[in-house]
A protein has these predicted regions:
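Conserved beta-strand scaffold positions in the cores of enzyme catalytic domains, especially
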Residues: 7-12, 69, 143-145
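Active-site-proximal specificity loops/subdomain of glycosyltransferases
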Residues: 1-33
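C-terminal catalytic/acceptor-binding lobe
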Residues: 109-110, 114-180
């Protein structure tokens, strides 16, 4: 029961997201894995997404001499600003330095533990934007988004956020429809 753990007025869907994040953060404390992938249930991934992210994590962490965040999606809304950016070569794709994301990302357990308080704030206190504590972490820990995208956030299909460009998402959907 999360009603006494989560504060602020939010929709039932946001409350469920917060409860899931809370549970995930608690589980990570006892997890032995080096890397963790927070993934919401409304993303479709390309077949190469996990492999690309794992090899790119190793490469970019080596370049920056610190662990990083990797997003599977190239969120179109991040192109609505005229900020300068930096592009790096990952395993087989280009990766763009970004300062915002939603709540699907890969990073190290170490980064999660070091930023546990800020991440737990997202799980216990509704703020708008909900991801603001995560964006604050990106000021200290580099975050990258793939070009082109490795996934699509299905909630964005009819929203101002839009679909990641240059991918045949209908084909990806068809390739994934038999996976359970």
């Amino acid at each position: 029961n999360f009603k006494n753990k989560i504060t602020g007025k939010c929709t039932p869907a946001k409350f469920a997201n917060m409860a899931n994040l809370f549970t995930s953060l608690e589980l990570i404390k006892n997890e032995s894995s080096d890397l963790v992938y927070f993934v919401e249930d409304d993303y479709i991934h390309t077949k190469e997404s996990i492999t690309e992210m794992l090899f790119t994590f190793e490469k970019l962490s080596t370049i920056f001499n610190e662990d990083v965040f990797l997003l599977p999606a190239d969120y179109p809304y991040l192109y609505s600003k005229s900020d300068n950016t930096k592009i790096f070569l990952g395993h087989k794709k280009h990766w763009r330095l970004v300062d915002e994301s939603l709540v699907t990302f890969l990073t190290s357990k170490k980064v999660v533990i070091e930023n546990f308080k800020n991440l737990m704030q997202m799980a216990t206190k509704w703020e708008d934007p909900w991801e603001k504590p995560l964006h604050e972490i990106y000021k200290k820990v580099p975050c990258f988004s793939p070009i082109p995208s490795l996934s699509m956030h299905c909630a964005n299909i009819n929203s101002v956020y839009g679909l990641p460009p240059n991918i045949d998402w209908k084909n990806i959907w068809d390739e994934n429809k038999n996976y359970k």
